[in-house]
Amino acid sequence: MVLAASPEAYRKVIEYGIKKTKLRIDRLFLQAIMAGIYVGMAGHACTALAGAYSTDPANPLAVSKATQKFLYASLFPVAFIAIIFTGAELFTGNTMTMLVCLLERRVTALQLCINWICSLVGNWAGALFAAYFLSYLPGVLQDPDHLHYLEDVAAHKTELSFLQCFCLAVGCNTFVCLAVWFVIASDDAAGKIMSMWFPIVSFCVAGYEHIIANFYTLQCALMHGVGPGVGTVILKNFIPTLLGNIVGGCGLVGAVYWYNFYPTVCVVQEARQPLPLSENAPSSTRQVVADLFSLWGRESSTPGVSASPPDAATNAGCSALDPPRNALLAAGKNFGNLSAGDRGALAEGIPGGACEDCLLVPRASFGGEYHPPQQGDAGRWCKPSKAAVGSGGVLCHVQSPAALEAVSNSPLRENSGVPSGGLLLCEGRVRRSSREREPERGGEEEGASPEEDHPAVTLSIPPTDFHPHVPREVEQSSLLEETRVAAENSALEEHPASTI
């Protein structure tokens, strides 16, 4: 079993949630119905097993309540295994994933509401179908032992106070969302099964309240005539359980880990081997570009609106051959308050010209897919074939990883703990255009070299508007002065004779 580290798992959770918004409503609803059916089928199997064991002390073969509860819990994870591996939509897990995407501005509130409503109603319909067609009509649970078990379970669930039921539901969906997190972080089937099994068993043994499981159990009890009544079930169980599940998934898991990891750069480059940068590793390249975007490259992104420079379409990869404009020299609104001399000073301030080609990437529209361009040899711009999901920022083409080893003199490095956020350093693989495949020497066939690998890397820096660690009070003038001093020192070190 291979588990991704927490930041990587968080990135996967975001991508997992974004994919849910791509589903058509009819398919979303159908998958939600199937999830409800899977929960109902597992609930039927658990009830058939646990109800077959008596807890009456007068019975010599009686088992304890704890044993009966564990028998029920041991089979219930089968429902979640079916849901994960078939791609069905379970409302309780969606509370976490969709909220994280909403807080990251990857989905709209409307998309979240559509997903929640469709998945909840579909889960209810699926659980109702399973309770009637798979449990009630076959008559498997109509013997006295199973009816007595159903009656006890229904009575216990509806005798709880509103606060008790709410708190039990909070704990339940915390376990469920952690199971979803573990599954997303796992890379193999066995790891997914093992990582989800124990949280699901735990919430069943703990007696927590799961709204979809209660849909099946209480509706099944009502159909068999051992339930307390429809109104009592809705008011005493369904409503507090639903609210508690939402609070548990959104509050104790989704919002907490969004706060811990936000912002995360989810730029998925066409890379052979992603190389994560150490948070504390000195990197003047990373820092200078982060400072640049911090002061002059912000985007005031609002839901449904992309506040981007005029060349945003090119920067977003819409053109495969035309080179994007250099963000350091752009004349758009993001850099309008910068004089030509200041822009030149910033460009020269990057040690060794390591990041001469910096691209301002606009925040993607909701759904978040764009193709960030990469550069191979000089003048050869292209876009990777794999879609990337990102929050916008500055993409910098770095000619050599050695450029990242210089020590930063930026004031932001001293005043902020981790100003670079979740950066990814990836080796780029560049596809040459058809015009560039023409033979450079006589005797070679046209198109003989369709691909070339270039030892180049791409940095992605998130905008400061969505970064809690970079202080906003740093003055532009002080940064420009620091950058000019750094540029002069660098020039003196590289060309000492020029000062004579």
From Swiss-Prot:
Location(s) in or outside the cell: Cell membrane
Topological domain spans for side Extracellular: 53-69, 135-164, 214-237
GO cellular component: plasma membrane
InterPro entries named in the record: Aquaporin-like, For/NO2_transpt
Entry-linked Pfam families: Form_Nir_trans
Modulation of this protein's activity: Inhibited by p-chloromercuribenzene sulfonate (pCMBS). Methyl methanethiosulfonate (MMTS) inhibits L-lactate but not formate transport. Inhibited by the Malaria Box compound MMV007839. Inhibited by BH-296, BH-317, BH-326 and BH-388 compounds.
Basic and acidic residues: bias regions: 428-444, 466-485
Region (Disordered): 411-500
Example of a GO MF term: high-affinity secondary active nitrite transmembrane transporter activity
Alphabetized UniProt keyword annotations: Cell membrane, Membrane, Transmembrane, Transmembrane helix
Membrane topology: Multi-pass membrane protein
Function in brief: Monocarboxylate-proton symporter; active in acidic-to-neutral pH range. Transports L-lactate and formate.
Subunit structure: Homopentamer.
Protein name per UniProt: Formate-nitrite transporter 3
